């Protein structure tokens, strides 16, 4: 009801649809559906760029910045999303989360693509995965830095198993290249 009063024309919900005077979409996972809809409404901007997702307990920011610098040195126009904010040539914005909420993220990716970025390096936090902030993005490359028992507790993850689950979620749909005999 608050969303409709603020001007929303549709509501996503997980349970029986409330009578709010607007279109209601009942879905098992409203956050995931919001992310997928945001991607579609923004024209699926991630498809226009090489998307590189970086996850791990430590080293996401350093790794993301190094990857962006390597791509830039190769002549690529690169966007970067993470702990230090979001930036691409001529633009810089602060963020509230390492991995922004899906609607904000998709709008930022759209701006990057429209400004000619052909690659985006993105820190993908475990909470970003848990709350489906990156749902709807098909990463071309996934980077895993490491895993240690941090981010366990109220407001984050209940235990290490949950933390591991959300870290691994970045690689749920991936191909592994294993030509090395070792």
Regions found by a protein language model. Name each.
Residues 1-36, 40:
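N-terminal leader/targeting and accessory segments in enzymes
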Residues 177-182:
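Conserved small/polar residues in nucleotide/adenosyl-binding loops
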Residues 33-175:
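Phosphate-binding loop of NTP-binding sites
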Residues 8, 21-22, 139, 174-176:
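Short, well-ordered alpha-helix to beta-strand connector turns
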